[in-house]
């Protein structure tokens, strides 16, 4: 008989321990089945832990005794201390945690020893009782009735010491949410941020709409789409890269203030800031321009910081961002000059000098690029990462802004802005191009770029041109990356930390 490899034995030991634990729990479940319904659904919870803490944490022992507050609560048992005839147990629900005080004498005869003490951490239980304060002044529930509602067959991660394997947190988010308070708080805060954005726009008479995820022509952004096929229509289709063109069709139709919070898809790389499937908000307002939207964005983000985070000062790692101060505003050229030494304004005015500047800063450019694209690439490589405090960058070249309105004083640039914090782009907005002939010409330029090998160039959308020919009122629109905004406001340094189910490579079998 061959000896077992030590490494193999080390790998098998935890699995064997897990198998033993699950076998014990399965036996307990079988015993529950023999006694009746093992998964009851007749317990009704009436209270949530965080609400109880908010209402009664400041009460004294005497006040709680006088109030005699009866509660009904349910959640997952996370900790338990058995002390003879009495036990303390901590349960976790959607609001947080609260302690139960369970005594043998308050329960049916033999229940404490034959039932309660045999339950396991991770089991979901329901309890009723009266609030009181312990000797250490902790708000707790003196239990008069307790039941097991769901038997957990698998143990909690590392016996409740937490789930520290980052990849496991992403692959098994349900375990991460059970074991890690910070993850729970991040996603609860994400929900509050999205609700705050929605409420802000609702209060200003914006209408929330839904537009198709499947499109026959992807548009609204420069990105490579995911391709699919519609069998019933025998039609190649794409997952949308942005909802922009459909939202502007709605403005043509008379819905003058619209927004959508939903997913978009771009078949591009994965990084700490990029996920192929991501959430964004786009909103459009008729009879407004890009300056109006800069003002709205500044006010909205300041409001979210103050009302959701409780402060206009946002801490991100070792950086501090001030959303209470006026946001910085400057043109792309101004920012390149301000944040880079040794560059003269004249160097940004011709193709020859821009190419020389790109070579000096080791910025890679392509021969078919125009001045605007080269300038934008120089900005992105030399300046963007230096925009730390909340900053609007304006005057984007028309060459890189195929859907934006040209500036009246300088038609080579557009009435467009991008918003940066911590060196990262969070938003992109502009006065919309509503000249159908100009838009058709820019679409043709995009088609030429696509034919020359640019996978991210836009398609020609004839129906959108037809919509513009019916008349799009003067309009401004904007898109904000929800995931990146949540990263900033929750001090999260990878996008996977703010996505409940981030994309992962399949595990090797």
Swiss-Prot record:
Q: What is this protein called?
A: Lysine--tRNA ligase
Q: Which family does it belong to?
A: Belongs to the class-II aminoacyl-tRNA synthetase family.
Q: Which residues are listed for Mg(2+) 1 binding in this entry?
A: 418, 425
Q: Where is the composition biased (Polar residues)?
A: 1-18
Subunit structure of this chain's protein: Homodimer.
Q: Which residues bind Mg(2+) 2?
A: 425
Q: Where is this region: Disordered?
A: 1-20
PANTHER family on file: LYSINE--TRNA LIGASE, CHLOROPLASTIC_MITOCHONDRIAL, LYSYL-TRNA SYNTHETASE
Localization annotation: Cytoplasm
The molecular function GO annotations come to: ATP binding; lysine-tRNA ligase activity; magnesium ion binding; tRNA binding
Which Pfam families does the record match to this protein?
tRNA-synt_2, tRNA_anti-codon
Q: Which PROSITE patterns match?
A: AA_TRNA_LIGASE_II (PS50862)
Q: What is its EC number?
A: 6.1.1.6
Q: Which GO terms describe its biological process?
A: lysyl-tRNA aminoacylation
Query: An example Gene Ontology cellular component term from the record?
Result: cytosol
Q: Which CDD domains match?
A: LysRS_core, LysRS_N
Q: Which reaction does it catalyse?
A: tRNA(Lys) + L-lysine + ATP = L-lysyl-tRNA(Lys) + AMP + diphosphate
By its UniProt entry, which NCBIfam families does this protein fall under?
Answer: lysS_bact, PRK00484.1
On cofactor binding, the record's note says:
Binds 3 Mg(2+) ions per subunit.
